[in-house]
């Protein structure tokens, strides 16, 4: 009960709860940094959302937060960590809400719509077939 109260207080104040609590309804663990979280929980810097469980958090849905790494699929709505770009899209990924593939930026990488273009890079050639038909731009060093 104490863990649940700390988690709720953290959600409403924008801080991080200490310890872990069980997400009501499905037994998912809610971690102080990353792990399974309920709606409204802040995503820590350097983390992304990688999975969605519709029945988690007593039917409100729960999100799995993990540290970002090169070549990770993330759910639609996940933050994009600085230095990373979006290079592919799967409309059925993340339990049907859509998923984006994150890669570290490098010269000659194809990026999807909504991908940030980091400083020192620019977009050039366009391919309408890229990113599962959403279109993609070749990103090169400026």
Model-derived segments and spans:
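Secretory targeting and sorting signals
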Residues: 1-23
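Post-signal peptide N-terminal regions of Sec-secreted extracellular proteins
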Residues: 24-142
């Amino acid at each position: 009960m104490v863990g649940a109260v700390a988690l709720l207080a953290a959600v409403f104040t924008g801080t991080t709860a200490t310890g872990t609590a069980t997400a009501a309804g499905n037994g998912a663990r809610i971690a102080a940094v990353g792990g399974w979280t309920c709606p409204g929980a802040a995503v820590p810097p350097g983390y992304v959302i990688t999975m969605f469980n519709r029945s988690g958090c007593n039917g409100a849905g729960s999100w799995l937060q993990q540290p970002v790494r090169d070549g990770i699929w993330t759910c639609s709505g996940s933050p994009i960590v600085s230095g990373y770009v979006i290079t592919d899209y799967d409309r059925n990924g993340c339990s049907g809400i859509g998923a984006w593939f994150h890669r570290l930026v490098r010269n000659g990488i194809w990026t999807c719509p909504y991908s940030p273009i980091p400083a020192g890079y620019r977009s050039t050639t366009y391919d309408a077939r890229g990113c599962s038909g959403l279109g993609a731009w070749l990103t090169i060093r400026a």
